[in-house]
Amino acid sequence: MSEAKPLHLVLGDEELLVERAVADVLRSARQRAGTADVPVSRMRAGDVGAYELAELLSPSLFAEERIVVLGAAAEAGKDAAAVIESAAADLPAGTVLVVVHSGGGRAKSLANQLRSMGAQVHPCARITKVSERADFIRSEFASLRVKVDDETVTALLDAVGSDVRELASACSQLVADTGGAVDAAAVRRYHSGKAEVRGFDIADKAVAGDVAGAAEALRWAMMRGEPLVVLADALAEAVHTIGRVGPQSGDPYRLAAQLGMPPWRVQKAQKQARRWSRDTVATAMRLVAELNANVKGAVADADYALESAVRQVAELVADRGR
């Protein structure tokens, strides 16, 4: 255990990544100790005092090695932060201290202090961008020894949404269910009940000018009771993406970096935008803005409002590019 890094800073507030980082530190420390029976103490960082922390970090008669995990360190008060800094500067041999810190909060400087002390940093920043979620999906599949293409990543994002924990679970389940043969068709097959799949399918048909196809897909989704707000949001996202990408030209990878989108999203929008003009995009944006209010209660018949908006958006480009 003496070779293990004694001080660890789990930095960020993406819960799944934080849990994994702490678990990795514990697993590594136990492996180095050669036993799973290493005492682990957990405590909120803001609740520690000098005496309590010294006691937690001190080897006992029964075990020379021990691990202390201090959570929510960003919210620790000034006194608690000082106690943690002091303890981290002089850890007893055989002790591992793990400090979980969001990176902000009133004890923001504590993270910088621990970093300057040589703490091993485990980045766990919240995953907020679509491109970051796409990278997370690829990483999850790679850890399961499965390689997926962009279409598969897109399908999974559309099917599962933005929750990182659900995305991780979906990746694991897909690999188990398909024996590793994961593609876009498999994603749609296993997640066919998700509203987002139908929402984006309807939106894609609408912005492609497929009036009949969009209307039919919408009726089917509504018959199954899909939330109107989700379907409306998918249409709005498709229109706004075309509005952002349409005026741009050039390499989709360069544009992706500029616009904060994944390259596959830019490439898809570039193809869709060929049907659209500045005026039709402006009209579509007005339609989806009105729809957003309508499906949230601005009109009595939200079903009709959604059907009308989908049809009107599709009709804007129904005769272009054919």
UniProtKB/Swiss-Prot annotation:
Q: Name the InterPro entries for this protein.
A: DNA_pol3_clamp-load_cplx_C, DNA_pol3_delta-like_C, DNA_polIII_delta, P-loop_NTPase
Functional summary from the UniProt entry? DNA polymerase III is a complex, multichain enzyme responsible for most of the replicative synthesis in bacteria. Pol III also exhibits 3'-5' exonuclease activity. The delta subunit interacts with the gamma/tau subunit to load the beta sliding clamp (dnaN) onto the DNA.
Tell me which family the UniProt entry assigns to this protein: Belongs to the DNA polymerase HolA subunit family.
Kindly state the subunit structure of this protein.
Pol III contains a core (composed of alpha, epsilon and theta chains) that associates with a tau subunit. This core dimerizes and associates with the clamp-loading complex (or gamma) complex (composed of gamma/tau, delta, delta', psi and chi subunits) which binds Pol III cores each with a beta sliding clamp dimer. Interacts with beta sliding clamp (dnaN).
State the organism named in the record: Mycobacterium tuberculosis (strain ATCC 25618 / H37Rv)
SUPFAM superfamilies named in the record: P-loop containing nucleoside triphosphate hydrolases (SSF52540), post-AAA+ oligomerization domain-like (SSF48019)
The question of whether tRNA-binding is a record keyword is answered with no
Which protein is depicted?
A: Probable DNA polymerase III subunit delta
Tell me which domain of life the UniProt entry assigns to the organism this sequence originates from.
Bacteria
The answer to keyword Cytoplasm applying to this record is no
Q: Which UniProt keywords apply?
A: DNA replication, DNA-directed DNA polymerase, Nucleotidyltransferase, Transferase
Give the catalytic activity.
Answer: DNA(n) + a 2'-deoxyribonucleoside 5'-triphosphate = DNA(n+1) + diphosphate
What's one GO MF term for it?
A: DNA binding
> Which E.C. number(s) belong to this protein?
2.7.7.7
Q: Name one GO biological process term.
A: DNA-templated DNA replication
Question: In the UniProt record, which is one GO cellular component term?
Answer: DNA polymerase III complex
What gene, per UniProt, encodes this protein? holA
